[in-house]
Amino acid sequence: HLESDSDPDQTIEAIHAAGCKAAVSVKPGTPIEQVYPYLDRLDMVLVMSVEPGFGGQKFMPAALDKIEALRKKAGSTLMIEVDGGVDAATAPLCVRAGADVLVAGSAVFGKPDRSAAISAIRAACENGESGL
């Protein structure tokens, strides 16, 4: 998390030195601009669309503005991931805003037919269906 006590520059350097890709997550209350100084060294940014800690929370629409701003600032090379409240209604909104990777925990694992849940999310994204 960007909000941790670790020095972001040192952490990113250590991750790259280990031959891995570097990513950082940003909590809902943190302005997305705080990640901008590190964009040239990051491979991915995870935009949290709920407060981290437990599943089943409602998607926070303010995350969409963060995704859009991040995509505009970083261009197409940075991967943007979204985690929290992602389902068939919110996933297309995230993709439209510029997200590349979606984490849909409760929307998949909270359903009796996980395959159907994944298919519904994919279909919604492909068809551009959305709504909060």
Where in the sequence are the language-model features?
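Residue-level detector of alpha-helix initiation sites
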Residues: 85-86, 108
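Catalytic cores of alpha/beta
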Residues: 30-42, 86-102
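Conserved anion-binding
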Residues: 1-79
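Conserved, mostly hydrophobic/aromatic
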Residues: 45, 70, 83, 94, ...
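Short amphipathic alpha-helical surface patches that serve as generic macromolecular interface elements
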Residues: 64-67, 91, 118
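C-terminal helical cap(s) of enzyme catalytic domains, especially alpha/beta-barrels
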Residues: 15, 95, 110-132
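Glycine-rich phosphate-binding active-site loops on the catalytic face of alpha/beta enzymes
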Residues: 2-4, 46-56, 97-117
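Loop/helix-junction capping segments adjacent to catalytic residues or to phosphate/diphosphate-binding pockets
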Residues: 6-9, 32, 88, 111-115
